[in-house]
Regions:
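Second-shell loop/turn segments in exported
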Residues: 30-37, 51-60, 97-99, 131, ...
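Short helix-loop-beta-strand segments that form the rim/entrance of peptidase-like active sites
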Residues: 45, 306-336, 344, 354
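Extracellular/luminal Protease-associated
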Residues: 48, 60, 120-221, 292, ...
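Soluble metallo-hydrolase cores and metallopeptidase-like ectodomains found primarily
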Residues: 103-105, 123-155, 209-291, 302-305, ...
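Metal-dependent peptidase/peptidase-like ectodomains
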Residues: 121-123, 220-223, 230-231, 328-453, ...
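Charged, amphipathic alpha-helical linkers/stalks
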Residues: 465-531
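Long, charge-rich, low-complexity alpha-helical segments
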Residues: 597-648
Length: 648
């Protein structure tokens, strides 16, 4: 393995260096125009506006954010600026997404009553993140009881929590049915922590954004506190001290709308302007939610401003295809849009998706250009990497020597090199929806990870680097503009980008010891995607053919409805329907492979179903992508999908 790692380093260095002078894919005049006009500062000023808003789905704060984006888009001269509204009443289904009702809050205070005096512990007015999403109104005075993680019945043994408030380390949604539903607790105080990184626990003042289960019958409230506060409370409880709390909450779900902001730069070609290249992000999340994901929202807005201005000034030609910009609530908004408006799904040929693209050094963020899933081969990811790899080299040369033609730094930003990584497919944002086999729209995914402040009170504008915003905007703008003009004249240049991408994929295959046949078929399919894109055909997910024999011969076909991934946002289509059909949870969903989790195996297993592959072939593809997985697990999951009416 040591030798493989060194080979990987050498090839990666070659692939990046080779993307140096001159700029790839676009004329240098176009690259210079983009570099000159894109502004990280303009993007950050817009970000500061969004970060003041608590942008929960369907809320007044989200609507204000949508209005802010729409107003800017109109001011920048974009066309067809709209705030689309789709009813969300808790009953309507948009594909695999059950529409969650809107949620709003006006008050949330948690205080301790002690010796006739009150001391405030948490205030929604001061920090909205302290009140868990989907909390319901309450006016409760009760003792606090420590239940550990709060997810296992044994943690409640010998404790009288009925009518009390429980202190738990798990997310409120994982606690509410057992604490409130089974044992009668009045509410929850949670100190749930972020996704684990090297910096976990380092800052015990972080307050994590919390969630209650939207569709749980056990309605309640939950407050989020820092690890520091939780430790103090736990120690007092350990010493048998009574802690008396008062919770005052005015909040709740109500029928509302999913709001999706959209705008366009119309294409110029009479035959191609009906096709669209979309820029995507997600507009929701807690205040401040600066990197996640005000950064993605304002960066695609900056791309829109820049392209519109340069086209209007004649510095860039109007693109042949229409360029569309979309600002939805995360995942559920995209799932709703593509199901409620199938004309959008039909017109969009490719997506540039941005989710967390501005994290400065304080966040410890690493910038990724993330490839698509193995089930949907496409050259568009290599296009994005061509620009990112070139910018890696330019920014490094500037950092190392002070001299570079295109360092793309911002006046208020840093001068560090970009150090972008071309990463294998990872899940967790709206790109999952686009690339689901229901829609099969390839999506470039630009994203930061890790970020030690994600989903917390400290994900603030102060941690956003304007240079990072400008560079992310450049990679996105250059990629989207190239694709919006792509024709047979660009095939040779795109093939050079594919060759560079293939080198890096070969390194990954060597390190993971991936079987050669699936990798070779994938590369042929990537090359074939050029012709599909140019012809206007919809990308096909069924290009790969396993070299393995079909020892498990059963073949499934996905039904036309429902469309979308099985797990969306705040709703698990598979789990809900499996319960109704009395189907046990398939083992695949809890499987941990070499390079993927059960969620990823399940996502791709469904994507690989095409009416041609056998269960054995799907297993082989999954093993090549995420590591060896037993055929029995895959076959069980496919049978379960058939059982809930997704496959036939």
């Amino acid at each position: 393995m040591r030798h493989m790692v060194w080979i990987g380093i050498s090839l990666a260095a070659f692939a990046t260096a080779a993307a140096g002078h001159p700029p790839p894919l676009l004329p240098e005049a176009s690259v210079a125009a983009l570099g000159d006009e894109l502004s990280g500062e303009t993007a950050k000023r817009n970000l500061e506006g969004l970060a003041r808003l608590h942008r929960q789905r369907g809320s007044r704060g989200f609507h204000s954010a949508a209005e802010l984006v729409a107003e800017r888009a109109r001011a920048y001269g974009l066309s067809d600026v709209q705030i689309l509204q789709f009813p969300a009443d808790g009953k309507i289904n948009y594909g695999t997404q059950r529409a969650r009702q809107a949620w709003d809050a006006t008050e949330g205070e948690l205080t301790e009553i002690r010796d006739g005096k009150s001391a405030k512990i948490a205030s929604y007015a001061a920090e909205p993140v302290v009140l868990a999403e989907d909390s319901e109104s309450a006016d409760v005075t009760a003792d606090l009881i420590d239940v550990g993680e709060g997810t296992q019945e044994g943690e409640y043994a010998g404790k009288d929590v009925k009518g009390k408030i429980v202190l738990a380390s798990a997310q409120p949604e994982a606690v509410q049915d057992i604490a409130v539903g089974k044992f009668g607790a009045a509410g929850i105080v949670s100190y749930a922590q972020n996704q684990r990184t090297a910096w976990s626990g380092e800052n015990d003042n972080l307050i994590r954004w919390g969630h209650l289960e939207t569709f749980s019958p056990n309605k309640t409230f939950a407050f989020m506190v820092s690890l520091k506060t939780a430790r103090l409370l736990k120690e007092r409880l350990r010493l048998k001290e009574s802690i008396h709390l008062h919770a005052a909450v005015e909040a709740g779900q109500h029928p509302g709308f999913y709001e999706v902001v959209t705008a366009t730069i119309p294409g110029s070609d009479s035959e191609l302007k009906g096709q669209e290249i979309a820029f995507s992000c997600h507009l929701d999340h807690q205040r401040p939610g600066a990197n996640d994901n005000a950064s993605g929202c304002v960066t695609i807005l900056e791309v829109a401003r820049t392209l519109q201005k340069l086209i209007g000034a004649g510095r860039l030609a109007r693109s042949a295809r229409t360029i569309r910009f979309i600002w939805p609530p995360e995942v559920e908004g995209t799932e709703t849009l593509l199901n409620a408006r199938p004309d959008y799904a039909k017109r969009i040929k490719a997506v540039v998706h941005m989710d967390m693209v501005g994290g400065g050094p304080e966040t410890k963020a690493v910038f990724h250009v993330t490839r698509g899933p193995l089930s949907l081969p496409s050259f568009i990811h290599d296009v994005a990497w061509a620009f990112a790899g070139w910018l890696n080299e330019e920014s490094y040369q500037f950092a190392a020597t002070g001299v570079a033609d295109y360092p793309l730094t911002a006046p208020e930003g840093g001068r560090e090199p970009l150090r972008a990584i071309y990463s294998s497919y990872t899940m967790g944002s709206d790109h999952d929806v686009y690339q689901d086999s229901s829609f099969a729209i390839p999506a470039i995914y630009l994203n930061d990870w890790p970020d030690r402040y994600i989903h917390t009170n400290l994900d603030s504008a102060a941690n956003i680097d304007t240079t990072k915003l400008k560079r992310a905007a450049f990679i996105g703008a250059a990629s989207g503009y190239f694709l919006a003009n792509f024709s047979s004249r660009d095939i040779a240049a795109a093939e050079r980008a594919i060759a560079m991408g293939q080198l890096l994929r070969a390194v990954t295959s060597m390190q993971r010891q991936t079987p050669a046949a699936p990798a070779a078929e994938y590369e042929r399919a990537v090359r074939g995607s050029l012709d599909e894109f140019n012809s206007g055909a919809r990308p096909r997910t069924q290009r790969l053919k396993s070299a393995a024999t079909a020892s498990a011969a059963i073949i499934y076909r996905r039904l036309q409805e429902p469309r979308g991934p099985m797990t969306v946002f705040g709703y698990d289509y598979f789990a809900d329907h499996a319960r109704s059909a009395a189907i046990a949870t398939p083992k695949l969903l809890n499987y941990e492979g070499s390079w993927g989790s059960g969620e990823e195996y399940a996502y791709e297993a469904l994507n690989f179903v095409d009416g041609r592959r056998s269960a054995q072939q799907i297993t082989d593809e999954l093993s090549a992508e995420y590591g060896p997985v037993p055929l029995a697990m895959v076959a069980e999951y496919l049978r379960a999908l058939k059982g809930i009416g997704v496959l036939e």
